Amino acid sequence: MKYSVIIPCYNEEDNVKRLINLLSSKSDLYDIEWIIVENGSKDNTRNLLNKICEDKKNFKLVYIDQNQGYGYGIVKGLENSSGDYVGWLHADMQVSPDSMLEFIQLNELSKEGKVFYKGSRKNRKFIDNFFTFFMSIFSTLLFQTFLSDIGAIPVLFHRDLMKKFDKIPYDFSIETYVYYIAKKENYKIIRLPIYMNERKKGVSSWNRGIFSKIKQSWRIIKALIKIRLKKE
């Protein structure tokens, strides 16, 4: 298997059917496995995934009984991956799976091994850009290397990078952590523009207004400080 794409699903019962059918239609384009992590959902996501994926090829289901964070779902997906290259997407369809396929296509043409692909989000609301800018400045100062749009997806990289992970975080700070490790290990960073879609179904588990953004940013700040202190 050349590519493993991880998609954590948490309370996404309204999206999983459309998501799985779309991924299935793309499965023959590349040597790819879709690792769907049922991340301890409290709704009917797990039952729907079992039913929808029953006759789908190139799909691997990973079950987590109790949600321990977005990053934990990614980690469990990585542990169950077999691809030479690994990466991840979200299940809410705000970023089209076609974006990951663009990354894969670019990688197929590349002759470099140490490349880290990461999205760069476009057409976002002012308030979202404001928080992203602030968090990018904070992360850049904290880790003493330029880090921009730290939460952007998709992400794709060679699995050799995983050997450099140490106590990978289980929350949303995983995005910054992996990005930072890639830069520290002198990976070539390639950013591709990602045009965001509005969430059509379901609700975000955390993004429900400006106060939720503040709380989420504060949680990530504390997590990043802990990561930085461990590196000292």
Predicted segments, located by residue:
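Short, acidic, metal-binding catalytic loop of nucleotide-sugar glycosyltransferases
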Residues: 21-31
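Short hydrophobic beta-strand elements that form part
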Residues: 4-8, 35-36, 63
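Hydrophobic helical membrane-anchoring modules
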Residues: 1-3, 8, 14, 18-21, ...
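Acceptor/aglycone-binding surface of glycosyltransferases and processive sugar-polymer synthases
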Residues: 64-80, 85-88, 97-172, 199-211, ...
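Acidic helix N-cap motif at the loop->helix transition within catalytic regions
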Residues: 14-18, 43-52
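Conserved donor nucleotide-binding strand/loop of the catalytic core
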Residues: 32-33, 46-80
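A conserved acidic beta->alpha catalytic loop
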Residues: 38-47, 93
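Donor nucleotide-sugar binding loop of glycosyltransferases
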Residues: 12-15, 41, 70, 96
